[in-house]
Structure formats: C-alpha cells, structure tokens
A protein has these predicted regions:
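Short amphipathic alpha helix immediately N-terminal
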Residues: 20-32
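DNA major-groove recognition helix of helix-turn-helix
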Residues: 29, 54, 61, 65
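Short, Lys/Arg-enriched N-terminal segment that forms or immediately precedes the first helix
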Residues: 2-14
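Helix-turn-helix DNA-binding motif, specifically the short coil turn and the N-cap/start of the second
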Residues: 46-47
Length: 107
C-alpha cells in the first residue's frame, strides 16, 4: 500500500486519539502537504520539533493499529465485499450487487 494512503487510513481510524496539537501538525504536514518549516513558523517552534512530532504521531498510530487491527479488518472486509460485488455482477444478481454497492460506499 502506498505510504500516503496508509498514513491517511491510520489517521482516519486513530487520529482522534492524538492530542489536538498533534492532530493539527499531522494534518498540516502529512495530509495538507505543508512544509515542516511552514508549520514550525506558524507554531513558533523549530523545524526539528515538527519533524519529531510527526515521527511520534506515526509511531503512535502504528502502535494503535498493531493492537487493534482496525485498518486491517476494514481492508479485509472491503476486499470481501468487492469480491461479492464481482460475483453478483457475473450472475446478474441485481439485489446482491445493490447491497454490496451500499456497503462499499459506507466503507
């Protein structure tokens, strides 16, 4: 999985467990693609401080996933529902396809 996608998924699932400041910095640097220097200047800290905070956030998010496996479960369910959708399309089972579409959209 692409690193950005992995980080975004981890943040989607576990971001609320970070402090407000960590969330702000992580969103700015990782999701909004702001430079470390820009974020450091906005917060009045040094660039290294922002870098260290991002590293700590990545570690915390990875640790949550190692313990809870929510992203892994989500990806497995999504894969299974996609397979159901493929099978339903082959057998023209419109109702199954409709249900699987709803589930995929919710995921």
């Amino acid at each position: 999985m692409e690193k950005f996608v992995e980080r975004a998924l981890l943040y989607d699932f576990y971001g609320e467990l970070l402090t407000t400041r960590q969330q702000q910095v992580y969103e700015d640097v990782v999701l909004e693609d702001c430079s470390l220097s820009e974020v450091a200047e906005d917060l009045g800290i040094i660039r290294q401080g922002v870098h260290d905070m991002i590293k700590r956030c990545d570690k915390a998010l990875s640790d949550y996933e190692e313990k809870l496996h929510l992203v892994e479960k989500f990806l497995n369910i999504r894969k299974q529902v996609q397979r159901i959708h493929e099978l339903a399309a082959e057998s023209h089972a419109d109702e199954i396809a409709a249900i699987s579409n709803v589930i995929l959209e919710e995921l």
